[in-house]
Design a protein with these regions (language model features):
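A membrane-interface helix-boundary motif in multi-pass transporters
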Residues: 12-24, 206-225
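Structural signature of the two symmetry-related core transmembrane helices
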Residues: 24, 125-140, 221
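Juxtamembrane intracellular "pre-TM" segments in multi-pass secondary transporters
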Residues: 37-65
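Extracytoplasmic gate region of multi-pass secondary transporters
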Residues: 60-101, 106
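Helix-to-loop junctions at the C-terminal end of transmembrane segments
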Residues: 110-123, 208
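Intracellular juxtamembrane helix-capping segments at the cytosolic ends
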Residues: 164-178
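A late C-terminal transmembrane helix in Major Facilitator Superfamily
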Residues: 176-213, 220
Length: 250
């Protein structure tokens, strides 16, 4: 919620190198604190490395990982360069950019609330709406920059949807992973998501270098469309099979 805008403010005041230096110091302090305060807990699972191929044969989990890397790639293709986009393409002042980034982050709390309220009622519809929403918003990013009001509204919706989508897939990972492999599945999910972050930043950088920063939304939107197509054509089908098998077993 506050990390990106706070980092931006620090960068504007004393330089971007100090932003990363402060992040390193804070991260080190947190690491030492956790190392000294958290107790060692014995493993409660019986998962071993030999079981990894069986975990990856879980079609729903594999689909979650595929969608997660596609989602993170599409999201960070645009979000990784949203600050210069708002300044150069939308023509916003430094203060307005900072305020928009704060709203972007804060809207994620609303996304978490919507998840808790509506996701349990219909998981398929919720995931489908989030997947289609992120694709639509990214494709409309450049058009929304014609007005400060529309680009701010789009950023708020974008922050809301991206948080809700991410939380939903964390739930799916826990729901469909074997009981003794939940921690491993979540670790893979985290690694896959970070791979998507790096891939998205790389694609966004290529767009900025060889095309225009104004087109980052189109690039991210095309990846998001792939996410939506995979979701509707393959992922939901595997989810329904797993849910049906679980119900039959019970």
């Amino acid at each position: 919620v506050v990390g990106l805008p706070l980092g931006r403010v620090i960068g504007l005041l004393i330089g971007w190198r100090m932003t990363f230096a402060i992040i390193a110091v804070v991260a080190t302090i947190i690491f030492v604190y956790l190392l000294l305060t958290l107790p060692q807990l014995p493993s409660r699972g019986s998962f071993t490395v030999r079981k990894m191929p069986l975990l990856l044969k879980n079609r729903v989990l594999l689909g979650i990982f595929i969608m997660s890397v596609l989602f993170a790639t599409s999201h960070y293709t645009g979000y990784g360069y949203i600050e210069p986009f708002l300044g150069q393409v939308a023509g916003m002042s430094n203060e307005a950019v900072t305020a928009t980034l704060i709203l972007f982050g804060a809207s994620g709390m609303l996304g978490s609330w919507l998840f808790s309220r509506y996701y349990p009622r219909n998981r398929y519809r919720f995931i489908g709406l989030m997947a289609s929403g992120i694709a639509m918003l990214l494709l409309l990013l450049r058009l929304s920059a014609l007005s400060v009001v529309t680009v701010v509204v789009l950023c708020v919706l974008w922050g809301l949807i991206s948080t809700a989508f991410n939380v939903a897939f964390q739930d799916c990972t826990i729901r469909y992973a074997p009981a003794d492999a939940t921690a491993v599945a979540m670790s893979i999910y985290s690694g896959i998501f970070n791979l998507g972050i790096g891939t998205g930043a790389f694609i966004g950088g290529l767009v900025c270098t060889y095309s225009s920063i104004a087109n980052i939304g189109y690039a991210g939107g095309m990846v998001a469309v792939l996410t939506l197509v995979y979701c509707c054509c393959r992922f939901f089908r595997n989810m329904r099979k797993a849910d049906k098998a679980s119900t039959t077993t019970c």
